[in-house]
Amino acid sequence: MHILGALDIPTSGTYILDEEEVQKLSDDDLADIRNKKIGFVFQAFNLLPRTTALKNVMLPMAYAGVPSEEREEIAKKYLQMVGLGDRMEHTSNQLSGGQQQRVAIARSLVLNPSLILADEPTGNIASAQAEEIMDIFKKLNKEGHTIVMITHESDIAEHAKRIIHIKDGKVFKDKKITVMGLGILGRG
């Protein structure tokens, strides 16, 4: 996941993202890729606890240089998309786990990344909320986003178009599923 997210550079082989060899890029270029082309969704949400949902979602746009007058409008759009239009002014510690994860998903989308990396995004939430998160990911995938997700939950992995099982750093099973609408990387 760290290599896919351009957080680590591969020591062998080639990683090409949007026609660029990642291992040949400068630190500044890698930071730019992480900010603009990749959306990250973490198991622990990584929200600022005393900051509103709206401001948490606006934060990546500040780093990307999006004009301040546009940030709020864009953040509101994505919070409404994940069903939190009525919770925008709540701080993250006033939100349920599922709501916090939806804020994290909205935050990952505000710069319209082509790749979304989700590390155990349903691991800390109730099963009903996990299904809501998977529905959001399916919708995003249908809109053209590539979703790579790590999960240990087989019922969550069943939402995938493809499941890759990795054990001890090696692929031991690669299964394509033709019914669903999401690409997932699983770890077993």
Give the predicted meaning of each segment.
Residues 168-172:
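Conserved switch/coupling elements of ABC/ABC-like ATPase nucleotide-binding domains
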Residues 182:
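Glycine-rich Rossmann-fold phosphate-binding loop(s) that bind the pyrophosphate
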Residues 185:
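Hydrophobic/small residue at the entry helix of a nucleotide-binding pocket
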Residues 1-166:
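ABC family nucleotide-binding domain
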Residues 176:
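A short, basic/flexible loop-to-alpha-helix module at the beginning of a structural domain
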Residues 188:
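N-terminal Rossmann-like dinucleotide-binding module
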